[in-house]
Amino acid sequence: MAKVKIGINGFGRIGRLVARVILQSDDCELVAINDPFITTDYMTYMFKYDSVHGQWKHHELKVKDEKTLLFGERPVTVFGNRNPEEIPWGQTGADYVVESTGVFTDKDKAAAHLKGGAKKVIISAPSKDAPMFVVGVNEHEYKSELNIVSNASCTTNCLAPLAKVINDKFGIVEGLMTTVHSITATQKTVDGPSAKDWRGGRAASFNIIPSSTGAAKAVGKVLPALNGKLTGMSFRVPTVDVSVVDLTVRLEKEATYEQIKAAIKEESEGKMKGILGYTEDDVVSTDFVGDNRSSIFDAKAGICLNGNFVKLVSWYDNEWGYSSRVVDLIRHMSKTTSKLDSVALACVDAVSTLILSSEC
């Protein structure tokens, strides 16, 4: 089977990690990168050395010329266009484009990639109008005619699988979520101007900073049964990677904590294996650096007040786990499109056979 050819727009944290995931896979191929702010030699350096995930050791990486990188013997074309519609994705064969700049997050802006020859665009951020998919939760609802989709946020990818299991088994009346979230590139190293979010302008390296997040509300978009039942907030903390969700919910059906643990463990070993994890170990955040699962339930960290009121805790590598899901979503989209193409081809063959038979 032919590899899925992927391009990346924006070579920041998520762009580079998505590239690492693609380059370590057997069924996907990175064919192009666009970033107007980085030269190929600096791009090589940024990709090779990563303070969190370590040095790249899988292929030799070098600059062939100012428009080509070599990963081993595999060439990757580099563009430097600011306007998405000017990026010639079609020349490289990139059918799927990961939009990871954080700028072009609505459908109209992301659709500009289609003008350059891309067939599908995956936004690596929440979107106000593009359909959102969380692998393990609602990716089966993807239809091949959808050309612009969102992979939601890293926090929604952690929360949604957990919320789905709890709602399916016990029912959620309402709930509040807090994510204790590692710092990201949008924060300040020292106190600086941040007109829209004054607290967000304070130094990330030695403050716990309350912040807003739409991650809990977004769960209602991927799980309509929970629409309006969840909301939440964030605390940004001075760690460089790995975050943790605290979900406190009121249940429809009474349940013991042991029953809740058993339900989550069952799903983590069944339909959601590889997406939802389960641990009873005495873990801390650094134990999950490089974990490619979306959500790892911490059985020892949760508590019950009574049979209807429970606090659940789940960890996630907000960088690597999320980047892994971006590629998984592309795989699913490709398989869905391929199945449709096969059905269409079979229909054409059947019609052709009927026509030939009637002519005879």
Swiss-Prot record:
Residues where D-glyceraldehyde 3-phosphate binds: 153-155, 184, 213-214, 236
Signal peptide, first to last residue: none
Catalytic function, reaction form: D-glyceraldehyde 3-phosphate + phosphate + NAD(+) = (2R)-3-phospho-glyceroyl phosphate + NADH + H(+)
GO biological process: glucose metabolic process; glycolytic process
Cellular component per GO, a single term: cytosol
Pathway: Carbohydrate degradation; glycolysis; pyruvate from D-glyceraldehyde 3-phosphate: step 1/5
Residues reported in the UniProt entry to bind NAD(+): 13-14, 35, 82, 318
Function: Key enzyme in glycolysis that catalyzes the first step of the pathway by converting D-glyceraldehyde 3-phosphate (G3P) into 3-phospho-D-glyceroyl phosphate. Essential for the maintenance of cellular ATP levels and carbohydrate metabolism.
Protein name stated in the entry: Glyceraldehyde-3-phosphate dehydrogenase
